[in-house]
Amino acid sequence: MEKKTKRQETGWNFDNSYARLPESFFSKLLPAPVRAPKLVVLNDSLATSLGLDAEALKSEEGVAVLAGNKVPEGASPLAQAYAGHQFGHFNMLGDGRALLISEQITPSGQRFDIQLKGSGRTPYSRRGDGRAALGPMLREYIISEAMYALGIPTTRSLAVTTTGESIFRETELPGAILTRVASSHIRVGTFQYAAATRSIEDLKSLADYTIKRHFPHIEAHETPYLALLQEVIERQASLIAKWQLVGFIHGVMNTDNMTISGETIDYGPCAFMDTYNPVTVFSSIDMQGRYAYGNQPYIGVWNLARLAESLLPLLHTDIEQAAQIAQNTISKFGPLYEKHWLAGMRAKLGIFNEEATDKELMEELLNTMEKYRADYTNTFLALTFDTNKDTDFFKSEAFTSWHKKWEERLSRQEESKSSSQQLMRDNNPAIIPRNHRVEEALEAAVKQEDYRVMERLLAALSSPYAHSPEQYEYATVPEPSTQPYRTFCGT
């Protein structure tokens, strides 16, 4: 995919490869201008990695681009069409409040989507106003950057700009636009959309484009579309295992929110688990617990089955044989997920080698944590540093019994105790974006226009494995509440 434009003073270096797909996949339009754009947070390090001049982005002209008031030379804004199963129900969807401005080609030749979220109505808006509120946009900025620092594949946030306009949800709220950066915004739902149009030519065009963009090493494969499915399964198995290992709950794992690239996308109702419980749900709209913490691997494979269904015409000319190929391929998700999860959990427990009983040891710890309502993140920190033993959980007979088995397990490997502790330090974060801390930062920013709380939180979250003293205050768990924490989509 060759780049088509010259580099501009700000560093914008655009290509529009997605716009070369069949026109059914998008609608071209310009972002709706806003009254009084103001930059409230810019990700300087991300800007630099994209080949952009951070200071130029802070200028009046730079902010105008981030707010959608100016379209840079070489950009060709478009809203993407896609479909999706939302809580199990199929719908034709699309970018209802976002525009892909263009694709930035970095100095190293990498390609990233630059998307404005909250940029106005599109042909896919349905009853929405196409705008976004400041709180949810800042929330996505905080959590996506925390996920990046944790080493979890994710879309990223370049900037949040206020619009000088109000939007109306339950109440009047300040409007904002998030500049999101992604390897691409191709989703499982994009393939569902292509399949729903019943155009094999369009489906093939999308698959070929996706392979060229994300998996060029399989272009010459004997069965490239099967290889594409296998690649996505592998990436999603790895991604969801990483979610589970840090206690991340996505909250809205619809098929339109599962990327082909393997990046986490859409941070609307997500949250991190405090007390360990597999049935934990934070999303206010997930009334049945479909997307609960413990369900995420199962929803992942369900979503991937929908991708496989969409690809059937490309897998084999005989539909029954295609279905069998898809089924055999999807069945590999479970073992792949378990492989990644076990490897990650071994690292969290300081274990270097493999033993057949490792899974049993891990599940015994988790079951004891659930019984005593132990904090997920802090339990692993306590094991890492041998601290915080004065609680019912650590005093319990069940934990004492497990701890003895764990020490015996560590003794059966060649690596030293200090090596095990270093492995644990490198895999057990000192800090996660705890819900009450995120809410504190958002309240100060939205209600008081005070961004200092958020800036301190972002600084602490930027190096979660540093285990520095300034991170300790963020390790405290929230006070017990009669009202469970709830998250909202922000739409």
Curated annotation (Swiss-Prot):
Pfam families given in the database record: SelO (PF02696)
Active site: D256 (proton acceptor)
GO MF, any single term: ATP binding
Enzyme class: transferase
Catalytic activity as recorded in UniProt: L-seryl-[protein] + ATP = 3-O-(5'-adenylyl)-L-seryl-[protein] + diphosphate; L-threonyl-[protein] + ATP = 3-O-(5'-adenylyl)-L-threonyl-[protein] + diphosphate; L-tyrosyl-[protein] + ATP = O-(5'-adenylyl)-L-tyrosyl-[protein] + diphosphate; L-histidyl-[protein] + UTP = N(tele)-(5'-uridylyl)-L-histidyl-[protein] + diphosphate
Known EC number: 2.7.7.-, 2.7.7.108
Keywords: ATP-binding, Magnesium, Manganese, Metal-binding, Nucleotide-binding, Nucleotidyltransferase, Transferase
The keyword Cytoplasm is annotated on this UniProt entry: no
Entry keyword annotation includes Manganese: yes
UniProt binding sites for ATP: G94, G96, R97, K117, D129, G130, R180, R187, D266
Cross-referenced InterPro entries: SelO
Cofactors: Mg(2+); Mn(2+)
Binding site for Mg(2+): N257, D266
PANTHER family from the UniProt entry: PROTEIN ADENYLYLTRANSFERASE SELO, MITOCHONDRIAL (PTHR32057:SF14)
NCBIfam families: PRK00029.1 (NF000658)
Family listed: Belongs to the SELO family.
UniProt function note: Nucleotidyltransferase involved in the post-translational modification of proteins. It can catalyze the addition of adenosine monophosphate (AMP) or uridine monophosphate (UMP) to a protein, resulting in modifications known as AMPylation and UMPylation.
Protein name: Protein nucleotidyltransferase YdiU
The species this protein was found in: Bacillus cytotoxicus (strain DSM 22905 / CIP 110041 / 391-98 / NVH 391-98)
Gene it is expressed from: ydiU
